Regions:
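Ribonuclease/tRNase effector modules and their secretory precursors
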Residues: 1-205
Length: 205
């Protein structure tokens, strides 16, 4: 069954981070409330999500930084990570494939205790839109919160008129999900827009 995803996603505004290296980013995140448990309300219905010190280590590793467009963009997203998780939607759900020789594959088997949720969201940095992909490890035993595992942020190109204000009083800006996910493939290499169903709104659009 196809995942139903929203028609639009709210854009999270980013600012330049006051740090330029992973060590300082780690210290800032620990002292500014990034680490800790997000409630179901905090995540806008995605369940509890834990952002741990181990999560930070993974998110600020060299390999994680390399997946984002620039380190500056990666650090800017860290400062708003909780907001990004809240405003993002679940775009993929798949098994936790076992890693062998540095690669995860269905051929290697799966971890039966965990499934992977991939969240997609939108941010704006220096007036340029960005796609944010956040990976959660969701424990199938509901007694444990999901674990924020990694995130990556990349610049995207859009056409004029593809962002629009959300109805007041939110005063937020949104992006059409069909634009956000254009060219994005799931873990199996299939375009996400082919395997997800965009929800309809009241006017049927």
């Amino acid at each position: 069954m196809k995942l139903v995803i929203p028609k639009t996603v709210n854009i999270v505004e980013l600012e330049n981070a006051p740090f330029k290296c992973a060590k300082d980013a780690d210290a800032w995140a620990r002292s500014h409330g990034i680490v800790g448990l997000m409630s179901n309300v905090d995540t806008a219905g995605k369940g509890e999500v834990a952002i741990s010190v181990h999560s930070l280590n993974k998110m600020l590793s060299g390999s994680a930084l390399a997946k984002s467009s620039t380190p500056a963009l990666h650090f800017a997203a860290l400062m708003r990570l909780r907001d990004i998780i809240r405003e993002s939607f679940v775009g993929e759900v798949h098994p936790d494939y076992i890693k062998v020789d540095g690669k995860r594959s269905p051929d290697n088997g799966i971890n039966p205790l965990v499934e992977i949720w991939v969240l997609y969201g939108c941010a704006s940095f220096a007036d340029f839109p960005c796609r944010v992909k956040t990976t959660l490890k969701r424990f199938l035993d509901n007694n444990f919160p999901s674990k924020a595992y990694s995130y990556e942020i990349s610049n995207i190109e859009i056409l004029r008129g593809t962002v629009a204000p959300v109805a007041r009083p939110s005063n937020k800006i949104s992006m059409d999900v069909s634009i956000l996910l254009n060219g994005v493939c799931d873990v199996n290499g299939v375009p996400l827009l082919d395997v997800c169903e965009i929800e309809t709104v009241a006017d049927g659009s």
